[in-house]
Amino acid sequence: MRIIDSVADMQAFSRDARRSGKTIALVPTMGYLHDGHASLMREGRTRADILVVSIFVNPTQFGPNEDFTTYPRDLERDLQVAEAAGADVIFAPRADDMYPAGFQTYVDVEKVTLPLCGASRPGHFRGVTTVVAKLFNIVMPHTAFFGKKDFQQLAVIRRMVADLNMDLSIVGMPIIREPDGLAMSSRNAYLGPQERTNALCLNRSLAAARTLFTDGERSVARLRDTVLRILTEVPGAAIDYADFRDSETLEPVEAANEKTLLALAVKIGTTRLIDNCVLGEEQ
């Protein structure tokens, strides 16, 4: 496995690979890798000749009072996880190489970034789309893999790729969960033992909504009441949003159907967690 920390070296590697007819898969990450990331890598491994995993804690997607400085980092462990999952190349650039002095160009997807996380984290998605566009230009992948836990992020990236005629395929991969149902996330490392138990309320509320939907409930108001009841029973849980949206457009809906997205963002203590499900999809 090769480690590349220079933008120029990564571009040179990818140009040579493409010239020789090889296909490239990219799994973009911020590091502190877990089995969710590994599932993306394993899928990427099956779909391309070369698997590149980027590890970069992107400063432009963090707000002024967010956790950029404390975001968990462990490069040595990340290298072991990536190699075990079949990575050929780790691209771990420096911030001053990605954003050199004088940098002033950003990619801003408009409508689909406004609700959900976009409402409570202004500027977040501008940072995400900018760094992802840069990674696409640097790594030059044929295919890139993203987890559906960040459902809105996946929708935003799909929109950017379509609107800017980027020549690659975007693959969304299922949420990977701990045995007790908690969605895997690097931020789970922040949770204390009691908070870790309390965090199970997210998946519990998703499961309750899915059960009601399967039993015939279509009223978003009644489904939301059930979700909120479960979340508010948990001490220290602060709800950012519990929203029902069309899973393709992210527009709000009043009557649920098979393609309705239930998206959650909840703070457990000081840790903001997100989770989601599409009501008609098997989990």
From Swiss-Prot:
| Positions that bind (R)-pantoate | Q61, Q153
Instruction: Name the Gene Ontology biological process terms.
Output: pantothenate biosynthetic process
Task: Provide the catalytic activity annotation.
Answer: (R)-pantoate + beta-alanine + ATP = (R)-pantothenate + AMP + diphosphate + H(+)
| Protein's pathway | Cofactor biosynthesis; (R)-pantothenate biosynthesis; (R)-pantothenate from (R)-pantoate and beta-alanine: step 1/1
- Compartments, record wording: Cytoplasm
Q: What class does this enzyme belong to in the EC scheme?
A: ligase
The UniProt entry annotates the active site at H37 (proton donor)
EC number(s) of the enzyme?
6.3.2.1
Kindly list the positions annotated as binding beta-alanine.
Q61
Query: Which InterPro entries did the record assign?
Result: Pantoate_ligase (IPR003721), Pantoate_ligase_C (IPR042176), Rossmann-like_a/b/a_fold (IPR014729)
Any one Gene Ontology cellular component term annotated for this protein: cytosol
GO molecular function terms attached to this record: ATP binding; pantoate-beta-alanine ligase activity
Annotated keywords: ATP-binding, Cytoplasm, Ligase, Nucleotide-binding, Pantothenate biosynthesis
Subcellular location, principal: cytoplasm
The function of this protein is: Catalyzes the condensation of pantoate with beta-alanine in an ATP-dependent reaction via a pantoyl-adenylate intermediate.
Q: Which HAMAP family match?
A: PanC (MF_00158)
Oligomer and partners: Homodimer.
**Protein name as annotated:** Pantothenate synthetase
Lineage of the species this protein comes from: Bacteria, Pseudomonadati, Thermodesulfobacteriota, Desulfuromonadia, Geobacterales
The encoding gene is panC
